[in-house]
């Protein structure tokens, strides 16, 4: 699936209603704003999600028909991680599953949820059963990160005439919300081999700074 380069209309009749169509739609709820792109939009030089994020989308969805190939999954995860980090947003990716595979084209049923570059949840690849993955995306953290990112604000000012269409909508929320995410009580202290890597990096940074000072002393 790819987005149309030029649409002859901004609206389409669907289920007896006239609804907007395009890659520039923002869906606003009382809690957050989200945008949608399709499949290879993510692979483009400037994905539609970039513009949507700059115009207020805090969560980005990608409905995909992404077939499998050797090494492709790692590249896909890298793309989603980078795009969610670059947009300072949550990114939810859902692709075709086993029921749509053939002998020539195979779909692994990739389901991925990222937040600002970090993986929150993923489905089991090549499962022969339907799957549902769930996670919470911290939209308040996303807003805070965007406020302190001067480059993000500068990009917002340079959007030009790329104007999104806002659509008021609402989520059907359950009365009880059970958190699935686990938060480290000591988030700034990594564990295992990562601790050694961070300590070595801190040491190298300090040494480089002191060495430069000694050169000019």
Which residues fall in each region the model found?
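Enzyme catalytic cores with a strong preference for nitrogen-chemistry domains
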Residues: 1-217
């Amino acid at each position: 699936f790819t987005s149309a380069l030029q649409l002859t209309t901004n609206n389409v009749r669907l289920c007896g209603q006239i609804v907007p169509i395009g890659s520039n739609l923002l869906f606003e709820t009382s809690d957050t704003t989200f945008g949608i792109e399709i499949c290879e939009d993510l692979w483009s030089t400037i994905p539609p999600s970039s513009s949507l994020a700059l115009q207020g989308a805090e969560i980005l969805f990608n409905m995909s028909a992404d077939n499998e190939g050797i090494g492709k999954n790692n590249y896909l995860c890298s793309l989603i991680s980078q795009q969610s980090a670059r947009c300072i947003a949550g990114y939810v990716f859902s692709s075709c599953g086993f029921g749509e595979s053939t002998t020539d084209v195979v779909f692994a049923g990739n389901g991925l949820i990222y937040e600002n570059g970090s993986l929150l949840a993923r489905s089991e690849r090549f499962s022969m059963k339907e799957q549902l993955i769930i996670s919470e995306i911290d939209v308040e953290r996303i807003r805070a990160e965007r406020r302190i990112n001067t480059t993000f604000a500068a990009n917002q000012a340079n959007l030009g005439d790329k104007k999104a269409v806002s659509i008021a909508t609402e989520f059907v929320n359950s009365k009880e919300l059970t958190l699935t995410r686990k938060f480290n009580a000591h988030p700034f202290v990594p564990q295992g081999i990562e601790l050694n890597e961070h300590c070595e990096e801190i040491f190298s940074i300090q040494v480089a700074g002191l060495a430069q000072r000694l050169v000019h002393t």
